[in-house]
Amino acid sequence: MDNTSALPTRFNVRAYFILFDDAQDAVLVSDELIFGNAYTKFPGGGVEFGEGPSQTVVREAMEEMKQPIEVTGHFYTTDFYLQSFFHPADQIISIYYSARMIGEQQFTDAQIAFDFKQRIYNEESFRWVKLSTIREDMFHFAADKRVARMLATMVR
């Protein structure tokens, strides 16, 4: 960027989890209504003060899905400049962890994309996507696209 006044003025740290199914051949994605628009992304959210990114994904899984999870490893951290799609004053740093469910599945998984019940603000729907069919164009956000591309290469 040539115009430094256009650069973000703060960092926004986000943490997401790549939750594999029991067979290790599908990952969970989150279809979400954000500001009235539908997006497919990986589950997770913003790191809050006083917590580390791996704690964020555990908290987010409980808040969004009522699902206990265990972080099993680091998967990816953004290694390119990423300006926030929603808040241009923010530069995004996204950290992705691989995870597994603790106990039985507690959330309802949708069979189709954007299976919203009421189409209300911030509604979420979760579904499994086979690694053999995952494509970066399924996702809207640049970091998620990168992770989808990485996941797609795992089955080749």
Task: List PLM regions with ranges.
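Nudix hydrolase/Nudix homology domain
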Residues: 37-40, 106-107, 112-156
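Conserved Nudix-box catalytic region and its N-terminal flanking loop in Nudix hydrolases
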Residues: 25-64
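Short, P/G- and charge-enriched loop/turn segments at secondary-structure junctions
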Residues: 1-7, 83-87, 113-116
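A generic structural micro-feature
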Residues: 7-11, 39, 87-93, 118-123
